[in-house]
Amino acid sequence: MGYGREESPEGNLDLIRYLQSWGLREFRDEASYYQWQRSILSEEELRDLGRLIEHRHGGEQVDCDIEFYDVLARPDLVPVLYSQRFNYFLTLGSSICSRIPPANRVLDFGCGVGILTSFFAQQYPGVEFVGIDRSSRSIEMACLEAEKRQLTNIRFEVSQVPQYQLSGTYDLILSTQALFQAEREPGLPSRSWRTFQREEDFKRQEQLEIRTGLQGRLNALLSALGPVGRMIIFEKTWNLGRRIFFQRALDVRGLRPISAPVPCRYWSLDEAVIDGPLYEVSRLSKGESSVWNEEPYREPGETLYRCVGRSAHRMGLELALDQVLETASGIHSRMGSWIFRFGLWNQVLVWGFYENSSGFKGLVIGGEEDRDLLHHVFETIKQIQEPDFERLVRDFWGHPANARDDSAIPCYENHHPSAQNIYEALPSKHIQQESTFQNGEGREMHIELGATKSLAYLYWANTFDQRQLVLIDEERAHILKAYYRESLESPQGPPA
């Protein structure tokens, strides 16, 4: 099963107004948020919070976690601290809310102060909701808020799962970032740096489930799930090693996806976050088989890379020697005459090279999988009217006056899983130097320096799905040699 289409929460005015009723505010930049935070909290309170966060992240102990969320449940702190998650609540709340029907009895596991639980109860007054959390202060606040909002179809309980048995059964169980909380756990490694595939290692799977606490929590929830019940789950499982580990934990318990898992994208202040995916699962019927996607998520356009100036010029000339598929040209009243070439390099890289008589040069390169997307850019440039032409060029490559023309800028760089496809397809590869490191825990890292046609390349890969491919013209190959040496000195990863 593939991935579902991302859903936009922007039109959910009910949820926006509801979050605002908690005192939450939406911020799109860190500076504004922290200025507002400092206007509300004293220096001493900020220092105490900082110490509490350090204490919590110093270990995975349950007591640290409970203490952390007990403090956060202060009525004066909730608006300040949870405003950082405004977009998270908006995105998750919208996605989950539409999936609640036809449930009649819903359990929200790890409900916190009940922000989303109470919203769901408000939207579905005929449905019974139960929220549980191990933080007693969070539950106290959740109860007060539900009473204030006169919600009669909801109750909250303190419960430490799996230490305490859950009572009753539910036809829908919700869990958002509460089942798999070991954030530093990378999950299952791949078989080697050459592949994204995992071994079927049941012993390692079970050991990880026990170590992370997932086994006990998931088993406890399943004991409370009705025979035809569903679970809607959103965890921090975007990294493939974590995702496959989590999916296999669901699969071994007879759970299957009943809708395509949906990636969730939201803003955390000024940082764009993609996480999840959001799973909707139920028990397998007799004779049914489950289909879980264990491939990396490929985002449209992820292979595309843009550069300007000398890097664009050098690489553009090299690419044009192979195959120019189409050319468009014209004259702009402000930018002068221009030409845009669209081509294919050795059946591996698609590219578009733009230059004008004002001296600006811009290049965009991508993998074959983004060929249609890049060709659409070419068609847009070819057909766009003059008033919008300059804005399009600036949006795509930046303002010419601000363009960096650093001689160390690569001609192409890719930090996504798709880098592996391009690396494997590079023509006439000649490996000049390579090193592979292992630490005995399934972690393996490979770094390779080489040449392909008249380009130099650096490739970096490990068994937790990180990939990096850098291409540069031969004249500047010494830059990649320096990167290679630095990486050998610090084998945790390539230099930024």
Named regions from a protein language model:
Residues 85-102:
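Conserved alpha-helix/loop element of class I SAM-dependent methyltransferases that forms part
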Residues 113-125:
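Conserved SAM-binding loop of SAM-dependent methyltransferases across substrates and taxa
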Residues 150-161:
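Conserved SAM-binding strand-loop segment of SAM-dependent methyltransferases
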Residues 142-143:
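Conserved SAM-binding loop
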Residues 178-220:
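Mobile active-site "lid"/loop adjacent to the S-adenosyl-L-methionine
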Residues 67-90:
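Class I SAM-dependent methyltransferase Rossmann-like catalytic core
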Residues 202-206, 228-235:
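Conserved beta-strand signature within the Rossmann-like core of class I S-adenosyl-L-methionine
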Residues 135:
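Conserved SAM/SAH-binding beta-strand->alpha-helix loop
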